[in-house]
Amino acid sequence: MRTYLVTGGAGFIGSNYIHYMFRKYDNEIRIINVDALTYAGNLENLKDVEKRDNYTFVKANICDKEAISKIFAENDIDRVVHFAAESHVDRSIRNPEIFVQTNVLGTAVMLNCAKAAWELPDGSFKEGKKFLHVSTDEVYGSLPDDDNAFFYETTPYDPHSPYSASKASSDMLVKAYMDTYHFPANITNCSNNYGPFQFPEKLIPLIINNALHGKKLPVYGDGKNVRDWLYVEDHAKAIDMVQEQGRLFETYNVGGHNEKQNIEIIHIIIETLQEMLPDSDPRKAHINNNLITYVEDRKGHDRRYAIAPDKIKAEIGWYPETMFKEGIRKTIAWYFEHEDWMNNVTSGDYQKYYNEMYEEK
């Protein structure tokens, strides 16, 4: 039985990946999930798998070398899938040090512990071991307003926020380990994810939640910044396929081919909520474009992201299966069915943060 060590598995993408892997492999694999359970980590995301005999949760910070070394010492880890990261640009602008510590130092700890566990006396590595570092397209910077411009694996790094700079630094550490030690690893750089379990500081769940509660829908700047949207289950599938079929030491871009302006996303959510809510639901009456409120633009706000997933399609056969219209309906339906989840995660610290970011502007 292959054993996976998943970091940040209680977060949005990590928990969706764990669900995907158990749906696909069931009892053929074992997953150890390491998460510090900071504000965006939520064990409710994993209540459907927590009683499985082949699932283990360990509360630990990836910066804690002793805790991570202990996991490797007590388990024969075959694969590391490294999601754990601070990931919200707005928070990075307010508290950049936290992002450097988790994203850079934490990745260094994970690499060192995996290397120590997997390296043989002659400097080679045990057969079948692999470290997959999950990163972002934001490391590439911003694209011009040109529909023919895309990020490729060869695009030079040009990060513009503390978040993207910290992720670029972590990518470079992984590249250095691959080059220096021939460490068995891959890097994936993905576009914006959306889907179930996403913490509502991110655009899509924020807009869904605010619209359902009749609150303003904040839009940075002119709302014309473009992002490429990737349904999270498609991303989970891509990560699994890179683990199984990806060439060692390679980077693969994972994009959704769903490029849309932020304001367009908001209009689509409003229209979809209107379509999906029954006329008898009193919330339907107040969900309209009047809720849209333009706020001061984010510092260093990149204008356009768009990924060309040509390499992963050609080498591995992965491509995004979920178009945005389908994905947003599935996402909204999930939030309809899990309103208790949303209510739980939007209380306390989140509400304080939301007020600081949007209500005071």
What positions do the PLM features span?
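N-terminal Rossmann-like NAD(P)+-binding domain of SDR-like oxidoreductases, especially those catalyzing
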Residues: 1-193, 243, 272, 338, ...
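A glycine/serine/threonine-rich, flexible loop-to-helix segment
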Residues: 49, 147, 200-208
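Tryptophan-centric aromatic hotspots in well-structured domains and transmembrane helices
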Residues: 39, 88, 99, 151, ...
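Residues at alpha-helix caps and immediate loop-helix transition turns in enzyme cores, especially N-
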Residues: 17, 42-45, 95, 199-203, ...
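C-terminal substrate-binding subdomain of Rossmann-fold SDR/epimerase-dehydratase oxidoreductases
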Residues: 16-20, 24-25, 31, 60, ...
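Loop/helix-junction capping segments adjacent to catalytic residues or to phosphate/diphosphate-binding pockets
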Residues: 40, 65, 197, 263, ...
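Residue-level recognition of oxygen-bearing side chains
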Residues: 67, 98, 105, 199-203, ...
